[in-house]
Amino acid sequence: MKSLVSSLLGACALSALSLAAQAETNLTIATVNNGDMVRMQKLTEDFTKANPDIKLTWVTLEENVLRQKVTTDIATKGGQFDVLTIGTYEVPIWGKKGWLVPLTNVDDVDDLLPAIRSGLTVDGKLYAAPFYGESSMVMYRKDLMDKAGLKMPDAPTWDFIKQAADKMTDKANEVYGICLRGKAGWGENMAFLTATSNSFGARWFDEKWGAQFNSPEWKKTLDFYVGMMKADGPPGASSNGFNENLALFNAGKCGMWIDATVAASFVTGKESKVADKVGFALAPDNGLGKRGNWLWAWSLAVPAGSAHAAEAQKFVSWATSKHYGEIVAAKEGWANVPPGTRTSLYKNPEYLKAAAFAPMTLASINAADPVHPTVKPVPYVGVQFVAIPEFAGIATDVGQQFSAALAGSMTVDEALAKAQAITDTAMKKAGYVK
């Protein structure tokens, strides 16, 4: 009898253990190695305490690698991830294809900034929740600008930027007037160069989807960029993306850096050697009615292939909530709350007091117009990207040519001719051009 009771007790214990194991859900989250995302991983105890049945596994990758892995996984229905970190390029395309789960429980959805929310919505359904939103702007060293005898306007021209870069450059002391993206990738150098080209009057395609890299506007864009970077940029610039330029700026090696508005809290944070010397301005223009700034939101989405969609939605709702912002504020200060997603943040006096960059961030986001991104008419939407599935592949190939031109291994004219050929071939193959 004793052994029967023992056996029954043992069986019950095993059954309880297996039930507990079944009850525990493991969410695999793919994310980018940017500062705000890395910070989130350290703050998830708030979520796991409230949801003890959910475990989180993080896959943190460099931007280009993340895009490749996530795209491959979702296109092949691999089911490797439960939460994806994707942006305003992927969401409308993947939402339309039925690859993402529509989100139904995002915290205070009407508080999301309209420009950001519309970029993540397909046919009235929200397919991703913004973790942080961004445009791009000029971050500059006020002390070096003073030393150069110049005053940065709130809305500078590219001519002023070139003049300031020339005067701020002091190569003997490893100070470079301008730091810009050079690393090849559709979301790296091509994000910057596409947005910049808009301000030079260029466009990717004419209204019949004909590639435009043989236009004088693209020639002006690339000549200006390569010329300025060779004169005033850091060595090895063709390998530098967002994170590399952030490290250079924080080390005091850049006079100006034109990049994501989200960098503002890092260049003024405790990791920065020049935190108290940084000013902000709108991305430059050429007087043609378009500035060189983009619009983007790193966002969290749930792939249709996830076996844990309900739990994944719970996590997405937590990470993009006002409550999460309050956790960051309590632990790291208001200036470090993920920016660019919620109207309420830009009305919060504590945030506005702590984040000197807030008004310029909001002005930059509001200045971007993804529906009318260019001076001449175009058949596409998107400021620093073209919202068609083929764009990522084409722009990555084009980005390699432009990175090579910056490195000096080919001329600007050769890079533009190759870009034209690559784009022509791909668009004909995809059936856009007959």
Located regions from the model:
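Short, well-ordered beta-strand elements
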Residues: 24-34, 54-59, 82-83, 127, ...
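Extracytoplasmic "Venus flytrap"/periplasmic binding protein-like
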Residues: 42-115, 119-121, 127, 147-149, ...
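Conserved C-terminal helix/tail region of periplasmic/extracytoplasmic solute-binding proteins
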Residues: 50, 146, 370-434
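Hinge/lid segment of periplasmic solute-binding proteins
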Residues: 87-136, 159-162, 176-177, 189-192, ...
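C-terminal lobe and pocket-closing loops
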Residues: 92, 262-274, 287-397, 434
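Short, solvent-exposed loop/beta-turn-alpha elements that line the ligand-binding surface or hinge
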Residues: 101-115, 182-185, 200-220, 269-273, ...
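Extracytoplasmic/periplasmic solute-binding protein
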Residues: 127-131, 136, 162-211, 254
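Glycine-centered hinge/linker elements that transmit conformational signals in sensory
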Residues: 164-167, 208-239, 279-284
